[in-house]
Amino acid sequence: MIVMKFGGTSVESAVAIERVAGIVKARESQRPIVVVSAMGKTTNKLLAIANAAIDGKREEYIRQIHDLRDMHSREARQVVPLSDRAALDRTLDEHFQELTELVKGLAVLGELTPRSVDAISSYGERLSSYIVTLAFRHFGMKAEHVDSRDVVITDRRHTQAAPNFPETYTRLAKTLAPMAERAVVVMGGFIGSTEDGVTTTLGRGGSDYTASIVGAGVGAGEIQIWTDVDGMLTADPTILAGGHRVKVISFAEAAELAYFGAKVLHPATVVPAIEKNIPVLILNSRRPEVPGTRITSDSVPCENIVKSIACKRKITAVNIHSTRMLMAHGFLHRIFEVFDRYETPVDMVSTSEVSVSLTIDNTSRLDLILGELRQFSEVAVEHDGVIVCLVGENIRYTPGVARRVFNALDGINIRMISQGASLLNLSFVVAEADLPRTVGLLHQEFFSTLDADVFERKEPAHA
């Protein structure tokens, strides 16, 4: 049994869905459970509809709902057989009528609560999974649809719900595992529900997490994350075009990369997979012949020090200075207590005898945090930073990595530098404007030669 997750770009159109059907049909003998994201940018469009409603823009949200229904109907009708068209239209009518009533309620209240965000954003995956199920039947597969809210049970923390693993695993084993023996199972990612049936979501990018949870719950042989890139690369392709494919990487390295911005993987994805020792593959739905990246529980011998360079953008650095800090017991605890109270995670920390510098990416409660910090210290804030993170298990065993970074980046201002507690990463902060040059220089420094067992070199394109 395998779990196959397809992201929004992989199911964004009839053409894309037909491509996915071909990929799944070729693996039908492996008893796939298919997890899909919303079609294209549907989640963003749903949230735009909600915001138009609370702003009182009735004509706008009615038009947006109409356009969204048209898009789903237009693409679905190209991949759904005539015999299922009536059922398709009926289901679309039901879902969009529900959505319209929900949005009208928001317009009356003029308020968008986290619970409402979850209810509205869930429609993307609910629609796409139903359409993909009908499409699979059209292309000759026996396919069954499962509402994820019946099997992925979470707490009540809306927009960032945490799974209730014992209950979820029980339901998955009882429902999905037997179903996968007789049909291709299709379900939406990202969404779940509380035990009493209130819709929740796992956070943006949570479809990867769903796939991992499902894989762990049914004891899958592997979890395949199908994206629009060839796997994990040595650098973000939006920053550096010449990144090489990473053939194999450890769970620990992949988790570090995901946390620090490698968008092909949701940071939490690897946790259930690690616990159940299930390999995860990152594959390209547009180029299914490419082997992608295999993520395994075991460390992978590698001649290169660094496996990949990740970047986390829109970072804010908070610099805290206090002469009273010198030898003061509990000063750091007092600082982190403030960030914890306002539920603001800290990414990096660097300390000296009289100052602490740290970075955050969530600034929604920054003013409140600064107000408390300034009661016992001087605080300066720098915006528009980027965390650049070198990840690789060999970093912990190799002296002089930081020296090589500083030498390679001569002339670029490095604001702070930190080695993670795992010793798998070396991270530092640079200005957004310096990011392309920083990544290019580091890539040249650490990937001029490649271990052929771990990397596939991307040859430069010739005119």
Role assignments for model-derived ranges:
Residues 1-266, 270, 429-431, 450, ...:
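Nucleotide/pyrophosphate-binding catalytic subdomain
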Residues 39-40, 150, 229-231, 276, ...:
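Glycine-rich beta-alpha junction loops
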Residues 222-226, 280-282, 347:
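Short hydrophobic alpha-helical runs that function as membrane-insertion/retention elements
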Residues 289-463:
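A conserved regulatory-domain signal marking ACT and ACT-like small-molecule sensing domains
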